[in-house]
Every structure is written in structure tokens, then in C-alpha cells.
């Protein structure tokens, strides 16, 4: 038998929506926007690392 704890009682409302699916697209478009922004961020970091994005007054040296 499961033991009831004060922490479990506090966290129970967070788990009450488990298994329920909101009809329609829900927050999928918002997730797509954030994925796109993350992709742009990664591309900028890659271009800085490759030195293909030139930043005036900013030198990058990878040697130790």
C-alpha cells in the first residue's frame, strides 16, 4: 500500500492532468517558434566558431 506524504499531497494537483490530451494543436505552434529560434542561435554559434561570421573588434582564438 502506498504511503501518503505531505510532499505527495502538495504535488498531486500537478499530476491530475496526466493522460489528458487537449484537442487541436495546443501549444505545438509555440514549440515550433522556439525550435526555430534555437536553430538560429545554433547557426550563429556555428558561424562564430567557423569564423564565417565576422564581428568587428571581436577576436576568437581557440588555441590554449
Curated annotation (Swiss-Prot):
GO molecular function: phosphate ion binding
First-listed, main subcellular location of the protein, grouped into a coarse class: membrane
Gene Ontology CC: photosystem II; plasma membrane-derived thylakoid membrane
Location within or outside the cell: Cellular thylakoid membrane
InterPro entries, A to Z: PSII_PsbH (IPR001056), PSII_PsbH_sf (IPR036863)
Keywords: Membrane, Photosynthesis, Photosystem II, Thylakoid, Transmembrane, Transmembrane helix
Membrane topology: Single-pass membrane protein
Keyword set includes rRNA-binding: no
Annotated transmembrane regions: 29-49
Pfam families named in the record: PsbH (PF00737)
UniProt GO BP: photosynthesis; protein stabilization
HAMAP family, A to Z: PSII_PsbH
Subunit field text: PSII is composed of 1 copy each of membrane proteins PsbA, PsbB, PsbC, PsbD, PsbE, PsbF, PsbH, PsbI, PsbJ, PsbK, PsbL, PsbM, PsbT, PsbX, PsbY, PsbZ, Psb30/Ycf12, peripheral proteins PsbO, CyanoQ (PsbQ), PsbU, PsbV and a large number of cofactors. It forms dimeric complexes.
Family indicated by similarity: Belongs to the PsbH family.
Function field: One of the components of the core complex of photosystem II (PSII), required for its stability and/or assembly. PSII is a light-driven water:plastoquinone oxidoreductase that uses light energy to abstract electrons from H(2)O, generating O(2) and a proton gradient subsequently used for ATP formation. It consists of a core antenna complex that captures photons, and an electron transfer chain that converts photonic excitation into a charge separation.
Protein name: Photosystem II reaction center protein H
Organism: Crocosphaera subtropica (strain ATCC 51142 / BH68) (Cyanothece sp. (strain ATCC 51142))
Amino acid at each position: 500500500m502506498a504511503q501518503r506524504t505531505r510532499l505527495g499531497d502538495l504535488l498531486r494537483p500537478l499530476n491530475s492532468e496526466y493522460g489528458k490530451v487537449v484537442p487541436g494543436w495546443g501549444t505545438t505552434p509555440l514549440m515550433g517558434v522556439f525550435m526555430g529560434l534555437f536553430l538560429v542561435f545554433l547557426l550563429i554559434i556555428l558561424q562564430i566558431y567557423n569564423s564565417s561570421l565576422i564581428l568587428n573588434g571581436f577576436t576568437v582564438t581557440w588555441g590554449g
